Amino acid sequence: GFLSAEEKGLVNGLWSKVNVDEVGGEALGRLLVVYPWTQRFFQSFGDLSSADAIMSNAKVKAHGKKVLNSFSDGLKNIDDLKGAFAKLSELHCDKLHVDPENFRLLGNVLVCVLAHHFGHEFNPQVQAAFQKVVAGVASALAHKYH
C-alpha cells in the first residue's frame, strides 16, 4: 500500500475521534465558500448567497455528511482506493462531469478542518499521513479520466 503501517495507525487513530457528520458538513461548506466556482454543482441546494447561508444550509450539511461517510468507508479499504471509489468516480466524473481538481480541493479543505478541530494533535506527521490519504482518494475518484 501507499501508507506505511505507522501512517495507517496515525490516520486511524485520529479518524476514530472524528465526528464524521459534523466535519463533513463543515468541509463541504468551506469548499463552497473558499472556492466559490464549485457552487455550480450545487445549484439545487437553495441559498448559497453568503458564507453564513452556506455553512447553515441543511442540504450542504447532508451532502457533506454523505461525502465524509464515503471517505470513512474508503479508509477501511485503504489499499484498494480505486476499487472503493469506482462507483462514486463514475457518478461524479461521467454523469456529473465534476472536474477532478475539485476532489483535491475538498481534500485540502478537509485537512484544514481536521487541523482546526484537533489542534496540537494534528501534528506534522499526522498531517503528512492525511495529505497522502486525501491525495489517494482524489486520484481514485479521478481515475475514470485517465
From Swiss-Prot:
This is Hemoglobin subunit beta-2. InterPro entries: Globin, Globin-like_sf, Globin/Proto, Hemoglobin_b, Hemoglobin_oxygen_transport. PROSITE patterns: GLOBIN. The modification N6-succinyllysine is found at K17, K59. GO terms for biological process: hydrogen peroxide catabolic process. Coiled coil: none annotated. GO terms for cellular component: blood microparticle; haptoglobin-hemoglobin complex; hemoglobin complex. It comes from Panthera leo (Lion). Signal peptide: none annotated. The modification Asymmetric dimethylarginine is found at R104. Belongs to the globin family.
